[in-house]
């Protein structure tokens, strides 16, 4: 995991959550999908992906779309449905499940109109449950179908125990092993 505030990292290791050694062929998992491209447009509850996207209707459902640059930069959401004919993905806020976008930069207003300057990244959606704390947010970097890094966007607060981390990607064939660490109530 990587913390953007101090640059500390935790990359994949050869150790499973239970401390046992990993099969080197499973490091990073298998079958994870990702896509980076320029949007055609979008609104408060949708994004129209690039006309070069070749995904079927189920490939991206449940995954996260992040606006990485241009109009809407910093916004992110869970993809709830995708029409490969129109390239329209419907999105929901990860914070409460309602239609729309969240923003990594809470002080920035959500842009309700996306345009041809909007670039996006579709990636596995990572979320945390339990542990007594809240607010931890992590992005997963995918290369060649494997998760190669986790980036801590927000380390959260109030964690008294290690939370459970879930990686959502309907394309995954072998789950990526990972280990979560907390220190001083936050992801470390």
Regions found by a protein language model. Give the residues of each.
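Conserved, function-critical positions that sit in or immediately flank catalytic
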Residues: 1-45, 58-70, 80, 111-188
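Alpha-helical and His/Cys-centered functional microenvironments
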Residues: 44-47, 85
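Short, solvent-exposed secondary-structure boundary/capping segments
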Residues: 83-99, 148-151
């Amino acid at each position: 995991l990587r913390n953007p505030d101090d640059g500390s990292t935790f990359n994949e290791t050869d150790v499973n959550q239970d401390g046992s050694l990993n099969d080197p062929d499973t490091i990073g998992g298998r079958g994870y999908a990702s896509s980076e491209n320029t949007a055609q447009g979008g609104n408060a509850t949708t994004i129209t992906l690039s006309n070069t996207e070749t995904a079927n209707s189920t490939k991206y459902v449940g995954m996260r779309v992040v606006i990485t640059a241009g109009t809407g930069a910093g916004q992110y959401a869970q993809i709830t449905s995708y029409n490969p004919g129109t390239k329209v993905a419907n999105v929901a806020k990860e914070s409460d499940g309602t239609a729309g976008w969240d923003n990594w930069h809470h002080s920035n207003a959500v842009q309700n109109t996306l345009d041809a300057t909007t670039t996006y990244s579709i990636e596995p959606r990572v979320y945390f449950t339990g542990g007594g704390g809240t607010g931890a947010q992590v992005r997963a970097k995918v290369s060649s179908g494997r998760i190669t890094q986790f980036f801590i966007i927000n380390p959260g607060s109030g964690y008294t125990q290690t939370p459970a981390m879930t990686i959502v990607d309907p394309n995954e064939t072998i789950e990526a092993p990972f280990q979560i660490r907390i220190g001083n109530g936050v992801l470390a």
